[in-house]
Amino acid sequence: MILLLEPLIAAAAIGGMALFLRVQRGGQRELVGRVLEPASGGAQLPSILYFTGETCTICHTAQRPALRALAAGLDAGVEIREIDIAVEPELARRYRVMSLPTTIVLDAAGQVTDINVGFASGEVLRRQLVDAGMPVAA
């Protein structure tokens, strides 16, 4: 009897997690197209908000290096802002961040254009910045 319950328990757990992620991502999708925080200092280019945490291994070993490599090839006016959710919990709540890492791409007006939950490669983020209005070098 116990052996029969294990697959059911596993299936219920997986289903519950899938539902949680769907609800979370659905809530964040509502933010696309909205301005939640005015662009800093008259920004002329898109920017990235990078939500991280002290204990987030993937944040430190993969996402941060990908963002640094991306930043090295970007125009100096593109801002990548690293936000520790323990230091700025209100900002994390405003953007409905529930998983780390999360990167949010904003256009020059501060409007949310893309939200990435989990690791986002430099290539993906560069494409999202271009879609948000970053000029492409000729």
What are these regions (language model features)?
Residues 1-34:
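N-terminal targeting signals for export/organelle localization
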Residues 30-45:
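Membrane-interface amphipathic/juxtamembrane segments adjacent to transmembrane helices
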Residues 42-55:
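Short active-site neighborhood of thiol/selenol oxidoreductases, capturing the structured segment around
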Residues 56-60, 103:
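The canonical Cys-X-X-Cys-His
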Residues 60-74:
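Typically the conserved alpha-helix immediately C-terminal to a functionally engaged Cys/Sec
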Residues 75-89:
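Thiol-based oxidoreductase modules, predominantly thioredoxin-like and allied folds used
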Residues 96-104:
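Structural micro-motif
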Residues 105-138:
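Non-catalytic, surface beta->alpha helical segment in thiol-disulfide oxidoreductase systems
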